[in-house]
C-alpha cells in the first residue's frame, strides 16, 4: 500500500489533477486497515516531503540563494520575496482551518469527486475562452510578476485545502486568470509548493509525529523516497508538455475521473 500511494503521490502531486484526491481514492480502494487512522491521514500529507525535494533539486539553479554577482542576488531576492508573499494566505488560512478540514473534508470521497469535476470544467472553460478570444498572456517572466499578483495567486492556493481541488491546479488557474503564461504559471506553482508543503508537513509532524511507531516512520521514509524519484520525472515531463499544449486535457481527465468515482462509489 505504501509503495502504491508513494507512486500515486509522485505522479499526481504537481499535475493539476489533485494528488490528495487521488491518494484518498486509492486509500479507499486498496484498504490500509493495518495503519492507524491518525497515521493514514498524516501519511497523505507528510509523504509530500519527497515530492517537495524533487522541486528543489529540479529548479535548484533558478532558486538557489548561492550566487556570484550582485545582480543575481537581487533577482533571487525578489523571486523569493514574491514566493513568500504568495504563501502568506495559505499560511494564515491553513493554520486556522487545518483541524476543520481534517475533520469534515479529508476523507470525504464525494467532495473529492465534485471538486475534480468542477475544476476540470474551469480548466476547459479557461482554455476555450482564451482560444476563442485569442487572449495572450501579459506576464511571461518573473521580472514582470508583481507582488500584488503573487499575493492574489496565494489566495487561489488556499482553495486546495479542499481535497480534490489540486494545489497546483488552483494556483495555475489563478495565475492564468491574472495574466501569466502557462509555463510561468506552472513554474510559480512549483515554487509556491516549497514553503507551503514544507509547512503542511511540519504541522502534521508537530501534531502527530510523537504518536508514530518505528514501523510507521519507516513507511514515511520509504514513501517519501519513492515520491521524490517519481515526482522528479513527472516535473520534467510536465514542463515540456505545457510549452506545447494547453491544460484542457487535464480538465477532461478530472471530469472523467470525477464521474467514475461517483458511479463506482455511489
From Swiss-Prot:
It is a multi-pass membrane protein. It holds the Pfam family BacA. GO terms for cellular component: plasma membrane. Its EC number is 3.6.1.27. It catalyses: di-trans,octa-cis-undecaprenyl diphosphate + H2O = di-trans,octa-cis-undecaprenyl phosphate + phosphate + H(+). The keyword Glycoprotein does not apply. Keywords: Antibiotic resistance, Cell inner membrane, Cell membrane, Cell shape, Cell wall biogenesis/degradation, Hydrolase, Membrane, Peptidoglycan synthesis, Transmembrane, Transmembrane helix. It comes from the Bacteria. It is an enzyme of class 3 (hydrolase). The chain crosses the membrane at residues 1-21, 43-63, 81-101, 109-129, 159-179, 183-203, 219-239, 246-266. It is found in: Cell inner membrane. Its main location: membrane. GO terms for molecular function: undecaprenyl-diphosphatase activity. One of its GO terms (biological process) is regulation of cell shape. Catalyzes the dephosphorylation of undecaprenyl diphosphate (UPP). Confers resistance to bacitracin. PANTHER family: UNDECAPRENYL-DIPHOSPHATASE (PTHR30622:SF3). Belongs to the UppP family. Bacitracin is thought to be involved in the inhibition of peptidoglycan synthesis by sequestering undecaprenyl diphosphate, thereby reducing the pool of lipid carrier available. This is Undecaprenyl-diphosphatase. The gene is uppP.
Amino acid at each position: 500500500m505504501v509503495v502504491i500511494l508513494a507512486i500515486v503521490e509522485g505522479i499526481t502531486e504537481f499535475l493539476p489533477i489533485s494528488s490528495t484526491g487521488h491518494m484518498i481514492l486509492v486509500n479507499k480502494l486498496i484498504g490500509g486497515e493495518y495503519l492507524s487512522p491518525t497515521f493514514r491521514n498524516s501519511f497523505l500529507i507528510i509523504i509530500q516531503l519527497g515530492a517537495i525535494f524533487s522541486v528543489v533539486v529540479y529548479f535548484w539553479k533558478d532558486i538557489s540563494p548561492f550566487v556570484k554577482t550582485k545582480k543575481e542576488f537581487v533577482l533571487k531576492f525578489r523571486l523569493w520575496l514574491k514566493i513568500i508573499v504568495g504563501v502568506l494566505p495559505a499560511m494564515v488560512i491553513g493554520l486556522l482551518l487545518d483541524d476543520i478540514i481534517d475533520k469534515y473534508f479529508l476523507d470525504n470521497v464525494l467532495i473529492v469527486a465534485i471538486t475534480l469535476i468542477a475544476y476540470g470544467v474551469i480548466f476547459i472553460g479557461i482554455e476555450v475562452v482564451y482560444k476563442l478570444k485569442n487572449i495572450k498572456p501579459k506576464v511571461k517572466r518573473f521580472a514582470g510578476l508583481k507582488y500584488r499578483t503573487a499575493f492574489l495567486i496565494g489566495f487561489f492556493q488556499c482553495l486546495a485545502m479542499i481535497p480534490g481541488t489540486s494545489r497546483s491546479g488552483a494556483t495555475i488557474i489563478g495565475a492564468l486568470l491574472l495574466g501569466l503564461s502557462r509555463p510561468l504559471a506552472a513554474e510559480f506553482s512549483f515554487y509556491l509548493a516549497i514553503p507551503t508543503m514544507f509547512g503542511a508537513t511540519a504541522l502534521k509532524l508537530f501534531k502527530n509525529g510523537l504518536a508514530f511507531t518505528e514501523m510507521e516512520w519507516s513507511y514515511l521514509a520509504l514513501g517519501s523516497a519513492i515520491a521524490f524519484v517519481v515526482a522528479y520525472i513527472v516535473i520534467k515531463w510536465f514542463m515540456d508538455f505545457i510549452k506545447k499544449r494547453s491544460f484542457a486535457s487535464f480538465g477532461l481527465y478530472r471530469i472523467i475521473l470525477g464521474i467514475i468515482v461517483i458511479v463506482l462509489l455511489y
